[in-house]
C-alpha cells in the first residue's frame, strides 16, 4: 500500500475557526478604512478651497492661455485665422495649368503640394493660413465681338477649365475640398481643408447664353463676372471705357442675365465692369452682389475700382467688395512702387464708406505678373492681417474681412434663390438681338406654321421644309427643290 497522510480533522476545524476570526477582523478594518476615506472626501472641497485661497496671490507665476497683448499682431492673427477661414475671392492658378501644362496634371511635371514658381501652391497656402479659395476658370476675350455669334471655342475652353479645376482639387483631398455652398466651406475649414470654389471671369465665357449660365451653375460655378476686358452680350466693360468707348452700362440681355443668376443662386460679380454697369446692376438685382477683385476708386482712380457712390449702393445691397493686389490698379503712375500699404488703404477706405460688413480679400494671385511689395505670394496673407491690426482693425473686424462677410453674402444669395424658386419663378428664356437660330438646319417637320414663316424671314428660305399646315390645320408635305 502506498504511504499516505490522512488529514487531521481536529486541525482542520481549528483552522476554519481561525480563518473565520481573521475574516471578521479584515472586514472590520476595511469598513473603518472606507469610513475614513468617506470623511476625507467630505473634507476635500474645503481643503482645495483653502489651498486656492493661499496660493491665489502667486497664480501669476503659472503658465496659462490668457488674453493676448493687443500689440502682439502675430499671435492675434494666428488666433483669428485658426478660428475663421481666410477666403480669397480670386486666384488664377487654373489659367497657369492651361497655359503651361495644357491641363495635363498627371504627367509628373508639377506637384501642387510643393513650392513652385509663381504665386500659388498648397505649401504656401498653408503657410498663409488660407481657409478657402475661389479658383477663376478664366478664358480670355481677345476681340470686341459685336454680334457675339462665334462663342463655341470660349465655352469649350471654359468647360475644360472647370474640368481641370475639379481634377486638381480632387488630386489633393488631404488639403483641398471642392465646395459649392457656404455650409460646405465652413465644414471644410473645420476639417482642416481649404475649401475650393469656382468662379467664371467674364460673361463672354457663356457665349451670351442664359441657358449656358444655368449649365455652368449645374457644373459647379458659383459666380460669374459679368464682363472681363471686353464688352459682351450682357454689358460694358471697364476696359472699353478706359480705351475711350462709351459707357453704355448694362445691356438688355444683361438685365435678364442678372435676374436669372438671382434665381439660380449664382453670385453676380461686378469686378471688370464699367461704372455705369455697376450702377445698373445694383439698381435691378434682387440679391447681394460681389466684387471678387476690385478696390476703391477714391483711393486710386482706376476704372477697375468702385466709386464711393457705388460703395454706398453695395452697403444698401448687402454685398461685398474684395480688395485686389494688382500693382497697376494700386499705383497707376508708378506700379513698381505699389506696396502692401496700398492694399491696406483700399481695405480701410471700403470699410469706412461701406462698413466692415462689406469688405473682403480678392488677391488675383497667379493672374498678374506684378504684385505689391510685401504681398509676393499666397504665404503673405498674415502680413496683411497684421498690418491692418497695426492700423487699428479689431479682431472682429478682421474676422469679417477674412471670411465671415463672403460666407454671409453667399448664404443670403442662396436664400434669395430658394425664395424665388419657391415662389414659382421660371428660368429666363431670352437671347440677344440678332441671334441666328437656323445654322445648319436639318430637314425636319415643323410643329407650327409660324416657325416656318420666321425661318423664311430670317434667311432660311433655302432649307427644305418637310411639312406645312394648310388653312384647315392639316399637315401637308412640302417638298422644296434643293
From Swiss-Prot:
Glycans are attached at residue 18. GO terms for molecular function: metal ion binding; metallodipeptidase activity. Its EC number is 3.4.13.19. It is a single-pass membrane protein. Its cofactor is Zn(2+). Disulfide bonds join 141-230. Keywords: Dipeptidase, Disulfide bond, Glycoprotein, Hydrolase, Membrane, Metal-binding, Metalloprotease, Protease, Transmembrane, Transmembrane helix, Zinc. Zn(2+) 1 binds at residues 90, 92, 201. Residues 1-21 have a biased composition (Polar residues). GO terms for biological process: proteolysis. It catalyses: an L-aminoacyl-L-amino acid + H2O = 2 an L-alpha-amino acid. It is an enzyme of class 3 (hydrolase). Zn(2+) 2 binds at residues 201, 272, 293. It is found in: Membrane. It holds the Pfam family Peptidase_M19. Substrate binds at residues 228, 304, 364. The chain crosses the membrane at residues 41-61. SUPFAM superfamilies: Metallo-dependent hydrolases (SSF51556). Residues 1-24 are annotated as: Disordered. InterPro entries: Metal_Hydrolase, Pept_M19. Hydrolyzes a wide range of dipeptides. This is Putative dipeptidase NECHADRAFT_87110. The lineage of its organism: Eukaryota, Fungi, Dikarya, Ascomycota, Pezizomycotina.
